[in-house]
């Protein structure tokens, strides 16, 4: 018993010393998400849950490694998001959902908290890493948002290779498209209206995004978001992910936010910038601001989803009003956290 107690004290002392030493550094932190929605433990096999957790951990560790070495927050979030874009598990890049016509249209945005510089792309079909192209728009163009064919022409000028759209094809996303179209036809037969039919689709068909927010050792915040959009979307629909202030926002004076959810609501309520404004002008904590917008503003009107937030002190908050949100975080004072379901 005494031996066990001594080991516990020694272990505790080491942890305390380690935390004290870490807290003396300039704070740095990163949080990521892989989308919010009807994500329930009963729907996962142990192997599936393990695979999702491993990919989330890989992404957050990749971004954290950049920060730990003194790298910029912009590089950290780009690195983390690229890991998620390369995974078929999440609705971005290789895991992008299908449009109604059976193709893939990708959106992304990024924002620099130092100066509010931002870049975004929407409706691209042949870009392997949308977040990288959004970064190039921010760094190498005089514009903020480029779309469709024009965005891809810009990509070619920047030396980005265009790829075939079918590289984003996955069996599980195609099966989801078929189910969505069947539901749409059934609802349309009743309503005689595509818009009304699409509104009646379950929330999971309307959500799915990846994103990251980070604070680096120099005190600079950044946020980025990437998505394949909404299953069975039509007419060139664009959601909140590439919209600065809705799906992405970062400002050193307040916080950095990346959102995931039913994009139309997040656009209408300027979710990302609203959270930052409450922090900046009302002196709210990110916990207060995030809870107010996600649970008090959006939830009552049917706006489902969540956000990840980091502030200038390295505090992290990840509120959501759905049954789950793929998420992970790490800071110089917090060990790696990975969560999927509520109450984790």
Regions found by a protein language model. Name each.
Residues 16-18:
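N-terminal signal peptide c-region/cleavage motif recognized by signal peptidases
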Residues 4-13:
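Sec-dependent N-terminal signal peptides
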Residues 22-344:
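Alpha/propeptide regions of enzymes that mature by internal proteolysis
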Residues 1-5, 20-23:
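Short, Lys/Arg-enriched, disordered terminal segments
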């Amino acid at each position: 018993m005494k031996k066990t107690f001594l080991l516990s004290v020694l272990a505790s002392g080491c942890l305390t010393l380690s935390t004290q030493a870490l807290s003396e550094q300039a704070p740095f932190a990163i949080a990521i998400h892989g989308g919010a929605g009807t994500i329930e433990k009963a729907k996962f096999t142990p192997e599936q849950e393990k695979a999702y957790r491993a990919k989330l951990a890989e992404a957050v560790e990749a971004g954290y490694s950049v920060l730990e070495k003194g790298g910029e927050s912009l590089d950290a979030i780009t690195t983390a998001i690229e890991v998620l874009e390369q995974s078929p598990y999440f609705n971005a890049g290789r895991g992008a959902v299908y449009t109604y016509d059976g193709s893939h249209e990708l959106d992304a945005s990024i924002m620099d908290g130092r100066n509010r510089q931002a870049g975004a792309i929407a409706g691209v079909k042949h870009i392997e890493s949308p977040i990288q192209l959004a970064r190039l728009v921010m760094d190498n163009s005089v514009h903020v948002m480029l779309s469709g064919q024009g965005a891809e022409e810009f990509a070619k000028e920047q030396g980005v290779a265009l790829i075939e759209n079918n590289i984003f094809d996955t069996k599980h996303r195609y099966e989801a498209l078929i189910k969505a179209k069947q539901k749409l036809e059934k609802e349309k037969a009743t309503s005689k209206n595509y818009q009304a039919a699409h509104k009646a689709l379950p929330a999971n068909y309307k959500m799915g995004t990846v994103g990251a927010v980070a604070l680096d050792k120099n005190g600079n915040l950044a946020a980025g978001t990437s998505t394949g959009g909404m299953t069975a979307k039509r007419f060139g629909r664009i959601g909140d992910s590439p919209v600065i202030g809705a799906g992405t926002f970062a400002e050193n004076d307040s916080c950095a936010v990346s959102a995931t959810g039913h994009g139309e609501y997040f656009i209408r309520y300027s979710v990302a910038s609203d959270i930052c404004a409450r922090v900046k002008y009302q002196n709210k904590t990110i916990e207060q601001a995030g809870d107010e917008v996600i649970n008090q503003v959006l939830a009552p009107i049917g706006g489902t989803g969540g956000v990840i937030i980091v502030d200038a002190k390295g505090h992290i908050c990840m509120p959501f009003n759905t049954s789950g949100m793929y998420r992970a975080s790490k800071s110089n004072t917090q060990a790696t956290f990975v969560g999927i379901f509520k109450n984790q």
